[in-house]
């Protein structure tokens, strides 16, 4: 019996000796990727709170610059024709001006491009909230076969072959391999600088300038806040010291009903599988809303007037319609004032967020 045990033990030893060694990543948890440069402050403009920043991705000048370059670079798509900015461009309030976005090889998305402007304040990203952070959001479109049609590995391989990019990654994160985690963190750092406030509303509401808004916009603000009128602030929130104009929650308005009266897009339900979330979509911010037509998650409303008229009608009735969506009793003047107020939410666009890959035309004297 002892001899048999010895042979078994010897066999186990030989088996273990022949087995492949565990990968380094399996032996030791991978060290977190973190920028190495000096942390910079992202200053929030009038009307907005401090910008939320994750502990593992503090903003640095190097990561912001790298993220800005990546954001505008078509290298992140399979045929190099689509960049992040293709669907989220400053000329359209960091959307794209289309009902649904164009993808690679003639593909079409199924939803309106969410605005990137002030997305730093969203607790969940995408219309359905499937990404918990800007970093995770930056992972999605690249690998979507319709949007950018690439793989994370393919992006990394392409960037490794670019000596300029490799040097910029090393400068931002320290010497080491280029990874998609670094790509996502750089893009997210840049997007946290894409914030806009100091609008006529902000100067009126928080800056003490009572002449900053027109009389029509001031009347529209009252319609916006009044629960018996627009009741808009119920979801598009205004706080004492700042205004995000979003409750960061999900609501069913009945947008996107098909000819059979069915919801064509299940929205938040696809993530939660909770019946109450059927057809519910994230409340978008209204900041710079005048710049980002068309509207709603499917881009079905071309103008702010169409949006207001939709709410006046009480949305589209369905089993899961949000309890706060009710027909509004607004006069034509109140409707027009409400639109004028929303136009007063157009804020100051910060410098340094346009395409760094495009050389500015020389100014002729």
Which residue stretches match the model-derived regions?
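Bacterial N-terminal signal peptides that target proteins for export
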Residues: 1-8
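C-terminal motif of bacterial Sec signal peptides marking the signal peptidase cleavage site
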Residues: 16-17
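Short, conserved catalytic or interaction motifs in soluble domains
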Residues: 20-21
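Generic hydrophobic/packing signal
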Residues: 120-123, 138-142, 159, 163, ...
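A gly/proline- and charged-residue-enriched helix-loop-helix capping module
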Residues: 145-149
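C-terminal capping alpha-helices of c-type cytochrome domains
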Residues: 152-197, 290, 300-365
